[in-house]
Amino acid sequence: MALDKSVILLPLLVLVLLVLGCLGRESRAKKFQRQHMDSGSSPSSNSTYCNQMMKRRSMTHGRCKPVNTFVHEPLVDVQNVCFQEKVTCKNGQTNCFKSKSSMHITDCRLTNGSRYPNCAYRTSPKERHIIVACEGSPHVPVHFDASVEDST
């Protein structure tokens, strides 16, 4: 009798654990927003911007993320890039898109010699076209691939 109950309960327990694991996981679109969107501010020449933002956005937990870009445009404008010029991603995938116009961004690069837990970043405000990888339905950005200067 006890064996019968465990045969029923074990698959149920596995199912519950799988569902709970999925509920707590950040979607790729939400991760993109957390790591790359800063719509409420303009590019900052404040030298501590990247140090503050990288920490605030959980990119210095357990390691120092070497490079990151923040986009200072409305989310809808960045989402619309998914319907603009299709380009090949750096990794060879074909789901990347380049913005028609330049966008205000801030590049954050780990400074030489900086080591976890003391992550220190160089802040570089720029105006560039962005390239993002998009997925899903509706098509939304899930990866920041690159930024490029105006080709004109």
Curated annotation (Swiss-Prot):
Active site: 36 (proton acceptor), 143 (proton donor)
Presence of keyword Metal-binding: no
Major site of localization recorded for this protein: secreted
GO CC terms in record: extracellular region
Cellular localisation: Secreted
EC number per UniProt: 4.6.1.18
Record carries keyword Mitochondrion: no
Annotated keywords: Disulfide bond, Endonuclease, Glycoprotein, Hydrolase, Lyase, Nuclease, Secreted, Signal
Membership in a protein family: Belongs to the pancreatic ribonuclease family.
The protein, known as: Ribonuclease pancreatic
Gene coding for it: RNASE1
